[in-house]
Amino acid sequence: VSLAEKGNEKANREYEQKIRTEKAANEKIHLQNRRTGMKNTDKDYFERFSFGDSPEMADELLALVLAGKKTATVSVILEDEQAPSVGDLSLVLDGLSTPACVIKTVHVETVKFCDLTWDMVKLEGEDENFEQWKSGNIRYWTRDAAKRGYTFTDQTPITFERFEVVKVL
């Protein structure tokens, strides 16, 4: 077997693996669409995520969502990431990455961190006052910035998203 043939065999194996991976991902999406009984109208997928940056935080924040206390979230959306849109359906995962509920985005607004207000962020349901929220989120986004390679300042654009639970799984 020549080197060229070995190279072609390797390329074919890699391509076949890519096709198997894509097929499995599509089957998972269709399974989740069947499981939830829902489908995004303009997308072939649900965004899947958990709130926070640890399994414990994901479970804690999910509990607030399911109790109706958390109806909004704030996030830093980097240039290469898709921002949420009104009407988007998202699959919220618990700390073990198990689907827990489907939420629908009902409002999206981007503001600088320094322009967020208590009326906005209290909808996150996590803190008792604005100063507590600010200090906790500065710590969170400082960790996030180090992981994702951006610089967090009070001028950082923040995406404020309100949502409603449309299905508990």
Q: Model-predicted segments: where are they?
A:
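Short, Lys/Arg-enriched N-terminal segments with co-localized hydrophobic residues
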Residues: 19, 23-37
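Short, flexible coil/linker elements and helix-boundary hinge sites characteristic
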Residues: 7-8, 149
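Extreme N-terminal basic, low-complexity initiation segments
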Residues: 2-6
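Mixed-charge, low-complexity intrinsically disordered regions
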Residues: 32-102, 108-169
